[in-house]
UniProtKB/Swiss-Prot annotation:
It catalyses: a (3R)-hydroxyacyl-[ACP] = a (2E)-enoyl-[ACP] + H2O. The active site is at residue 53. Its EC number is 4.2.1.59. It comes from Neisseria meningitidis serogroup C / serotype 2a (strain ATCC 700532 / DSM 15464 / FAM18). PANTHER family: 3-HYDROXYACYL-[ACYL-CARRIER-PROTEIN] DEHYDRATASE. The gene is fabZ. Pfam families: FabA. This is 3-hydroxyacyl-[acyl-carrier-protein] dehydratase FabZ. GO terms for biological process: fatty acid biosynthetic process; lipid A biosynthetic process. GO terms for molecular function: (3R)-hydroxyacyl-[acyl-carrier-protein] dehydratase activity.
């Protein structure tokens, strides 16, 4: 599969099954097969989670940042295998060493940098970092597992 960068949201949807309101990636900006992927998400006050988290102090839920990191990891795995295959999915399988270092608020641009650490028997282990303005917001080790459904 010839990968043309950047990969925009409409084409990300051809790679991973997530859709609004759960698609958390806006663009893929860098990709090296079986090694690294960089993606971005523009955080907007118009996203539904900000109605309740929190109305007077909107903060992006950490669990959604982790989900976005997992989507970036799955996208790295899928692109590294030449694209999405019918009925094949990468599921979030685990997380270790998660650290939340700063809040993410509307107007921020999250930059996700993911690196494949190991891949064995359909399970990938990734180092994932989410940054805002060059500062680490969240970091974690994420596992994704390939399944045919």
């Amino acid at each position: 599969m010839d990968v043309q960068l950047p990969i925009e949201a409409k084409d990300i949807q051809k790679l991973i099954p997530h859709r609004y309101p759960f698609l958390q990636l806006d663009r893929i900006t860098a990709f090296e097969p079986m090694k690294t992927l960089t993606a971005i998400k523009n955080v907007s006050i118009n996203e539904p989670q900000f109605q309740g988290h929190f109305p007077d102090l909107p903060v992006m839920p950490g669990v959604l940042i982790i989900e976005a990191m997992a989507q970036a990891c799955g996208t790295l795995a899928i692109l590294s295998e030449g694209g999405r295959k019918e009925n094949e999915f990468f599921f979030f399988a685990g997380i270790d060493e998660a650290r939340f270092k700063r809040q993410v608020i509307p107007g921020d641009q999250l930059v996700f940098e993911v690196e494949l650490l190991t891949s064995r028997r359909g399970i990938g282990k990734f180092n994932a970092v989410a940054k805002v303005d060059g500062q680490v917001a969240v970091e974690a080790i994420i596992m994704c597992a390939k399944r045919v459904v």
